[in-house]
């Protein structure tokens, strides 16, 4: 009970006391005095009740403001929580992508190391050395890209005097595909990689690329990349190292232009 409420209760109690003190024996003058006192007390009580009413209204206003502020605070907390959830999901997604890229790089290094080991063992086991042909350029590509680009490129390079290792020119019926590819990789001065969406899906093309990377890891810079109907983001996702190399692009250069630029590098023109 507040102080004002206590005052009001005391006044009502006094009014009741005065009313109870009025009896049949009360003289007219005393009755008049008591009635006047009751009237004053009632007026005082009315003022107190009015003040209490004002205080109650103010309290309700304050409570409403506090409730509204609390609701706004809850909304802000919910919004911040959602923002944090979105940020956390993005960070998790970025971390997963980073781990995938890291795994691809590790797998490539493992494959390159295995390739070096396989080649070393193969060389050791071949006690009678065979003379293998040498090539200026090894062309690594997906079969889906032969018709529209790779075959015309290989033919144009030959016309320019470049000795090309290209499966249609080199492989014969009965040849071991893996042995011939290993021989071509070992005995080529340079290797051009025709990067396309089909290329990155193939096991054989990845095997060939691992062989070229292994050569480069031994200090021989030889990879000459060509982007064919592929975006930079695709290449970045596949191999950040390849994406960092200066590449020719079939969307910018014609087959003849690409062939001449390759020949200039290979033949030191």
From Swiss-Prot:
The active site is at 208. GO terms for molecular function: NAD+ nucleosidase activity; NAD+ nucleosidase activity, cyclic ADP-ribose generating; NADP+ nucleosidase activity. Residues 133-266 form the TIR domain. It catalyses: NAD(+) = 2'cADPR + nicotinamide + H(+); NAD(+) + H2O = ADP-D-ribose + nicotinamide + H(+); NADP(+) + H2O = ADP-D-ribose 2'-phosphate + nicotinamide + H(+). PROSITE patterns: TIR. The record marks 204 as: Important for ADPR cyclization. Changing residue 205 to A: Slowed NADase activity. NAD(+) binds at residues 143, 172, 202, 245. Homodimer. In the presence of NAD(+) analog 8-amino-isoquinoline adenine dinucleotide (3AD) forms filaments with 3AD between monomers; conformational changes occur upon 3AD binding. This is 2' cyclic ADP-D-ribose synthase AbTIR. It comes from Acinetobacter baumannii (strain 1295743).
